[in-house]
Amino acid sequence: MSGISLTSIDALIAEKHLLKHPFYRAWQDGTLTSEALRDYAAQYYRHVSAFPTYISALHSRCEDLETRQALLANLRDEEEGPENHPALWRRFAEAVGCSASEIDAGDVQPETAGAIAAFRAAVAEGPVVRGLAALYA
């Protein structure tokens, strides 16, 4: 990656750290409304449930065995067993008051659809390292 270190990538990511976003600050401060949390939980479930497909797409394009094995281990963490990530997120969404229909069939906000499309493009098109960076960040 011509002079770019993992440390420098981590520093770039830290500038945009998730917990710096106003939504997460409101959540941390206890000022986030229950309605906003429910909407977030239902929307984010779409991304969490799609995440294993991002890994699968990247795994299928990767030629490096060691990297493929790491992706496979991550995919197992995402999907295997009853404590898989989509199931855990679903339980969280239900715990904050989302109904099954809100989680599964509710309207997908344009921002959510855009994020999912961006991840799908990052892992399916261009260099594999681009997809790895998207999953890492």
Model-derived regions: residue spans:
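Acidic, low-complexity proline/glycine-rich segments
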Residues: M1-F23
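Generic serine detector
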Residues: S2-S8, S34, S49, S56, ...
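Active-site-proximal alpha-helical scaffolds that flank and shape metal-associated catalytic sites
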Residues: I4, Q69-A137
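Alpha-helical bundle segments that constitute or directly flank the non-heme di-iron/ferroxidase center
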Residues: L12-L18, A26-E63, E80-N84, R130-A137
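Broad hydrophobic/π-residue packing in well-ordered secondary structure
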Residues: L19, F23, L37-Y40, H47, ...
